[in-house]
Amino acid sequence: MLFFVKICIFQSFFVLLHGFYGLRAGTHSIDMKELIEKAKHIVIFTHMAPDGDAMGSSLALWHYVREFKSSRVQEFKEVTVIVPNAFPAFLSWMPGAEQIKIYEKESAACNPLIEQADLFLCTDFNDPKRIGPMGEKMLANPVPKILIDHHLMDERIRGLVDEGLWVEVHSHPEACSSCEIVFKLLRDEWISGLEDERLPNEIATCIYTGLMTDTGNFSYNSTNYELYEIIAFLLRAGVQKDEIYNAVFNQYSTDRQRLTGYALYRKMRIFPEYHLALITLSADELDQFHYQPGDCEGLVNMPLQIADVFYSVTMREERAKPGTPKSRIRLSFRSQGDRPVNVWASEVFHGGGHMNASGGEVLGSLAYAVKLFENSYMKYIKK
C-alpha cells in the first residue's frame, strides 16, 4: 500500500511539472525519441566558451543517449559532444567531461564526426554562429537537427526556425537555464527510452550544475517555485549539492583571485548617476595573471554587490588569431530588477540574452568597444 502511494505521488509530481513547463514543439510532428532510436551517429553541440549550463545540458543529453534503450533498438550508438573551444577547468570534474571533443584543438577528428552524423542535438544556443566554424559544417549536413535553448530569438533566428532549419524546437526564454528544459524533456518525453525510470546520478548531477551556475547559485532568474521542485527531485536522485558547489566555486587558482582583485581595484569605473559599473581588461592585463578560460566567470556580478549599482558590464579582450585582423572584445551584461540589458547588448554589441543577463562582442580594439559603450549607455539605462 505504501509503495502504491509513493508511485501516485511520483506520478502526480510530474503531471504538475508537465503543466508548468509546456514546451514549444517544432513545425514537424516528429517524435524526438524516434529520431534517437533511428540515429546511429549523434553529435551534440553547445556554444563557444562553454559555461555550466552548456556543459550540463550537453552532457546530460550525452549520458541519456548512451543509456538509451528501447524494444526496437539495442545496438551501440556513437554519440559525441563537441564544443567550439576550451571549457573552464572548474567544470572538468563533470561526469563525461573527459570525453568532450574541443573543435579548436581537434578539428581534424571532429570534422568526419560532423559530416557522418545522422542527428544533431543543439543545446544552449539558437544561432549557428554561436558554435563558430562548426556552424557552417552543421548546416551543410541536411540531417535532422533538434534545438533546446532558453535564449531569446531575434528576427533572423526566427526566420531560420520558420524555414525549417530545426526539425524540432524547444525554445523557452522563461526557463532559468537550458538544463531546466532538458530535465523536463528527459523526465516527461524521453523517460521510456531509459532502461528503468530512475534518473541516473550522472544526468542529475549535470542538470543541477547547469541550474546552479546559470542562476548564480540561485541568486537571480530563480524566483519560480517550480524550479525548487525540480531541485528537490534532483536531491532525491542523489545529487550532492555541496560537493558540486565546492567543485565549481571553491577551486579557483591564485592567479584568478589576484585578477579579480586587480579588476575591482584598478579597472572598475562607476557611473553614479546611472547606477552603472564598467570593468575592462586588456589581453596584456590578462596575460599578467596567466588567464585561463573561465577566470572572469562571475566577475560581472560583483559590482552589483555595491549599494546603488544596478547595472554592470565587463569587457575582456581576446587577441586577434592568425588570419583575423582584429581583436575580439567579449562583453557581459548584468542588471537587477526591472532594468533590461538585453536590448542594449543586441542593438549595440551584436549580442543578446535575458533581461538581466546578456552577452555581446565587438570586433576591434578595446578602446573602440569602450567608445561604443560611452556613446550608448545613456540611451539604454534607466536613471
Kindly give the residue locations of the regions a language model identified.
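Active-site cofactor/cluster-binding pocket
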Residues: 101-167
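Short hydrophobic alpha-helical segments enriched in small aliphatic residues
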Residues: 5, 15, 19-22
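Short alpha-helices
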Residues: 150-230
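Hydrophobic helix-and-loop "lid/oligomerization" segment in the mid-to-C-terminal part
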Residues: 22-48, 56-95, 99-102, 108-119, ...
